Design a protein with these regions (language model features):
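A conserved acidic beta->alpha catalytic loop
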Residues: 30, 36-47, 57-58, 93
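N-proximal low-complexity "stem/linker" segments adjacent to membrane-targeting elements
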Residues: 1-23
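Short beta-strand-to-loop element that shapes/binds the nucleotide-sugar donor at the catalytic cleft/hinge
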Residues: 112-126
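Active-site-proximal specificity loops/subdomain of glycosyltransferases
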Residues: 44-78
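Conserved nucleotide-sugar donor-binding catalytic segment
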Residues: 129-186
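Acidic donor-binding/catalytic loop of UDP-sugar-dependent glycosyltransferases
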Residues: 92-105
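Short aromatic/hydrophobic "clamp" motif used to bind/position activated sugar donors
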Residues: 85
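Short, acidic, metal-binding catalytic loop of nucleotide-sugar glycosyltransferases
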Residues: 22-31
């Protein structure tokens, strides 16, 4: 079966990347792939063990010299061919049922904002809040490519929120999950 989602992971080769990729490999539904775009790495010849150890048929590697998270994510967006695009930072993890839940509960939506939990227990957006507000949402979302090529603003604070605002202008068919399936720095 073809992957339904590509996870775009900008990275500076943190040690936490291994844990991030492991959270993908632990998915109960195997229909995913990922592209890790190494920021500050020039060319396809990656020699750092932290970089080469994560490569597999489901995990592609790209390099970009001197980018910012928005620019680096845009490289991944342009490379993605799956129906859905999702985002994951290299020090975060996702719940093992993320892909399965997307496919079976949210596939009729155009984009999904997953509630995220910080190490201190803070959940954003808060459980009773079903709106997207600045500083109360992060990169814990995915969207369908049928909305068109939407890109992040380069080198800008708040690029995650701005991207979500672009999505909201295109569709009213979206959801904030009740599930907390994205873990920040876990």
């Amino acid at each position: 079966m073809e992957p339904i989602i590509t996870f775009i992971i900008p990275s500076i080769a943190r040690l936490t990347l291994l844990r991030t990729v492991e959270s993908l490999k632990n998915q109960t539904d195997p229909n995913w792939k990922s592209i890790i775009i190494y920021d500050g790495v020039d060319g396809p010849d990656f020699n750092d063990e932290r970089i080469t150890i994560v490569k597999s048929p489901k995990v592609g590697l790209e390099g970009h010299k001197n980018g910012q998270s928005g620019l680096v994510r845009n490289i991944g967006i342009k490379e993605s061919k799956t129906p859905w695009i999702g985002f994951l930072d290299d020090d975060d993890t996702i719940h093992p049922d993320y892909v399965n839940k997307l496919k079976n509960s949210y596939n009729d939506k155009d984009f999904v904002v997953w509630r995220m939990k910080y190490e201190n227990g803070l959940v954003l957006p808060p459980i009773k809040e079903n709106t997207i507000n600045f500083s109360r949402v992060g990169i814990s979302f995915c969207y369908k490519q049928t909305l068109g090529e939407i890109l992040f603003d380069n080198n800008r604070d708040g690029e995650d929120f701005d991207f979500l605002m672009k999505l909201k202008k295109l569709t009213n068919n979206w959801s904030i999950t009740q599930e907390v399936y994205y873990n920040v720095r876990h």
